[in-house]
């Protein structure tokens, strides 16, 4: 096996999904290294992380709409594959029974500036105790679970938008600076 230069080129593109690239025969016997990301890191355009083996990887994803998802492949060579792992996190899960209930839930959650994610027929959002309690009081029957947040709805505050309100609520240390990039200091 050839020794790979530990410094990779800057990652500027997502090459495809791991399962699809394996089915196409583009990934065969190469070892697969993972870059673990929190859900809020997947929105960042510029990012520096390390793989599970300690290899440093730099991302510069400047194309519109590029967002890292679980099992995205960002590097392929004859000796190595690097794929993304979105780490599971505590989430609120809603299972609306009707389209009007889905619309109301999304509207109300979006109005509170929380990022929304789709997981099949369910709506998920990062766990926040005040939000969970508000959803219970509003009759939505939320559940707490641990899941990967990866299919973000595009028209909400997690993507950033141009207005703000003078109020605050607890995001358990996660916040953004009006740019939609949630993070923790």
Swiss-Prot record:
Composition skew (Basic residues), residue ranges: 162-175
Keyword list, A-Z: Chaperone, Cytoplasm, Nickel, Nickel insertion
Gene label: ureE
Keyword Magnesium: no
Name this protein carries in UniProt: Urease accessory protein UreE
Alphabetical GO biological process terms: protein folding; protein-containing complex assembly; urea metabolic process
Superkingdom of the organism of origin: Bacteria
Ranges that cross the membrane: none
Disulphide bonds in the chain: none
Protein localization: Cytoplasm
């Amino acid at each position: 096996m050839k020794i790979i230069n530990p410094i990779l080129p800057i990652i500027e593109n997502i090459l495809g999904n791991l399962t699809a690239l394996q089915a196409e025969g583009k990934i065969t016997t190469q070892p697969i290294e993972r870059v673990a990301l929190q859900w809020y890191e997947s929105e960042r355009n510029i990012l520096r992380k390390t793989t599970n083996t300690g290899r440093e990887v730099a991302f510069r994803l400047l194309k519109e709409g590029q967002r890292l998802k679980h099992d995205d492949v960002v590097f392929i060579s004859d000796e190595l594959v690097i794929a993304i792992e979105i780490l599971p996190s505590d989430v609120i899960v809603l299972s609306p029974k009707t389209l009007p209930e889905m619309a109301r839930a999304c509207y109300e959650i979006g109005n509170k500036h929380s990022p929304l994610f789709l997981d099949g027929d369910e709506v998920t959002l990062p766990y926040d105790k005040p939000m969970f309690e508000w959803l219970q009081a509003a009759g939505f029957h939320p559940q707490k679970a641990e899941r990967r947040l990866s299919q973000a709805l595009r028209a909400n505050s997690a993507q950033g938008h141009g207005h703000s309100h003078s109020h605050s609520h607890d995001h358990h240390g996660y916040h953004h600076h009006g740019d939609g990039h949630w993070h923790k200091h």
